[in-house]
């Protein structure tokens, strides 16, 4: 059976496998994908929040508190819950096991962390705000520090192959838009790369990207609510 990915908005996705619904960085769900799934599904529901930025974290997720198995969040996320035992706060380097779900938090080059999740026999990586944040017009020292920090975080990755990787391709970076994702692909081989965090015009891979990674399978959602089946 294929797993299914639902694009919510920005960096928000639902990853559905045979037993679970994994919700990453829920911010908006304009097409009500989650509510629709929950009407007919008894699968275990997990929320993942990489950090507290408003485009990655919506406190409204607590309205599913009774339905959810767990809320797995970076420790900088503040969320008041009636069922505090369902809340699991992590920092980079932590590993958490809940049932058949194993979660490792890696670092970020902005706020919070990134998630490596093993569930249903698959390995899923969600980068959060981990990226090579090079900005035209910023001081050279700042951009050099951003480069150093990014490659330092990449060096920590022990998993060289994943089934699905969600990674930022931010339009605001202009010429540097692909620097982070291309460097990530030099370190890790995802069977499917999913573009996120566009912040503007939808990413169309450059000739350089396609020349370097001609065999890389991509999903670049076009609109909120888009759906992708993964290969078995």
Regions found by a protein language model. Name each.
Residues 1-5, 100-101, 160-162:
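Beta-propeller blade-edge signature
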Residues 5-11, 85-95, 156, 173, ...:
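Binuclear metal-ion centers of metallo-dependent hydrolases, dominated by the metallo-beta-lactamase
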Residues 11-16, 113-117:
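Short beta-strand scaffold segments in enzyme catalytic cores
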Residues 12-48, 52, 59-64, 130-159:
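Pre-active-site segment of Zn-dependent metallo-hydrolases
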Residues 23-27, 43-55, 71-76, 125-128, ...:
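Active-site neighborhood of phospho(di)ester-bond hydrolases with catalytic His/Asp-centered motifs
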Residues 68-124, 215-232:
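Metallo-beta-lactamase
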């Amino acid at each position: 059976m294929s797993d299914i990915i639902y694009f919510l908005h920005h960096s928000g996705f639902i990853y559905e496998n045979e037993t679970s619904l994994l919700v990453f960085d829920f911010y908006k769900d304009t097409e009500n994908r989650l509510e629709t799934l929950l009407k007919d599904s008894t699968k275990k529901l997990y929320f993942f929040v990489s950090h507290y930025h408003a485009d990655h974290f919506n406190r409204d997720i607590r309205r599913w508190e009774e339905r959810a198995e767990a809320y797995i969040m970076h420790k900088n996320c503040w969320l008041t819950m009636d069922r505090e035992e369902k809340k699991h706060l992590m920092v980079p380097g932590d590993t958490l096991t809940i049932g058949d779900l194993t979660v490792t938090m890696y670092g970020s080059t902005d706020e919070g962390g990134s998630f490596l999740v093993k569930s249903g026999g698959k390995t899923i990586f969600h980068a959060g705000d981990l990226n090579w944040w090079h900005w035209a017009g910023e001081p050279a020292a700042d951009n050099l520090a951003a480069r150093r920090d990014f490659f330092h975080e990449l060096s920590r990755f022990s998993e060289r192959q994943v089934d699905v990787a969600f990674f930022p391709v931010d339009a605001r970076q202009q010429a540097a838009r692909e620097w982070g994702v291309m460097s990530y692909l030099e370190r890790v081989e995802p069977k499917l790369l999913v573009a996120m965090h566009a912040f503007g015009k939808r990413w169309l891979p450059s000739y350089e990207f396609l020349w370097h990674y001609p065999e890389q399978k991509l999903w670049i959602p076009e609109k909120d609510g888009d759906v992708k089946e993964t290969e078995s």
